[in-house]
């Protein structure tokens, strides 16, 4: 069964973007390449259990096992040593990526308190979009009673778009609720 968002991309977004930006080929139309979800757990320096809990939550949210990230260099001010595990990340591609994006746009973002749309200024100049989420409770897989601490995460949506305008139109076509 094809994903709902992927079908929308094929049937609606590609023709709309081709018409707006006059692409010569269907292959020139921007698409979502991957989604990277990163959860930095600073308190993992003192307590390794918090990182395990965060990684388990990230696995529930994304549907795949996260990669544990380690500190690249020592920083005395943060009492951090090189090689210490301080976070977890997941890279989603293909079917899982579309499923996550669909869930993010239609279920999770509307559950954010006082939500007025995601900021339009979070593009990086190359059509990629970065979104910060303050709490993991917006995802339906997370059980409120099992949460020991509210943790945020960074969600980076990497597209093949060359400009921010193309990336914005692609994500808007896929249903991303940008602030007016």
From Swiss-Prot:
Gene Ontology molecular functions: rRNA binding; structural constituent of ribosome; tRNA binding
Ligase as UniProt keyword: no
Protein keywords: Ribonucleoprotein, Ribosomal protein, RNA-binding, rRNA-binding, tRNA-binding
Gene Ontology CC annotations of this record: ribonucleoprotein complex; ribosome
BP GO terms, sorted: translation
Highest taxon in the source lineage: Bacteria
One Pfam family per UniProt: Ribosomal_L5_C
Record carries keyword Transmembrane: no
HAMAP family: Ribosomal_uL5_B (MF_01333_B)
Subunit structure of this chain's protein: Part of the 50S ribosomal subunit; part of the 5S rRNA/L5/L18/L25 subcomplex. Contacts the 5S rRNA and the P site tRNA. Forms a bridge to the 30S subunit in the 70S ribosome.
Family per similarity comment: Belongs to the universal ribosomal protein uL5 family.
Protein name per the record: Large ribosomal subunit protein uL5
Source species of the chain: Streptococcus thermophilus (strain ATCC BAA-491 / LMD-9)
């Amino acid at each position: 069964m094809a994903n709902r968002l992927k079908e929308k991309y094929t049937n609606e977004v590609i023709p709309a973007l081709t018409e707006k930006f006059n692409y010569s080929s269907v292959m020139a139309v921007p698409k979502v390449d991957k989604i990277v979800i990163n959860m930095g757990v600073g308190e993992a320096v003192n307590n390794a259990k918090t990182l395990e809990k965060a990684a388990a939550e990230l696995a529930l949210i994304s549907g795949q096992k996260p990669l544990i990230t380690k500190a690249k260099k020592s920083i005395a001010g943060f009492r951090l040593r090189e090689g210490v595990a301080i976070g977890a990340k997941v890279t989603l591609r293909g079917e899982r990526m579309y499923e996550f994006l669909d869930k993010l746009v239609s279920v999770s973002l509307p559950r954010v308190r006082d939500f007025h749309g995601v900021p339009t200024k979070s593009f990086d100049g190359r059509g990629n979009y970065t979104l910060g989420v303050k709490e993991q409770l917006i995802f339906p897989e997370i059980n409120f009673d099992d949460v020991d601490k509210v943790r945020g995460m960074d969600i980076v949506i990497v597209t093949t778009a060359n400009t921010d305008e193309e990336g914005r139109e692609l994500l808007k076509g896929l249903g991303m609720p940008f602030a007016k």
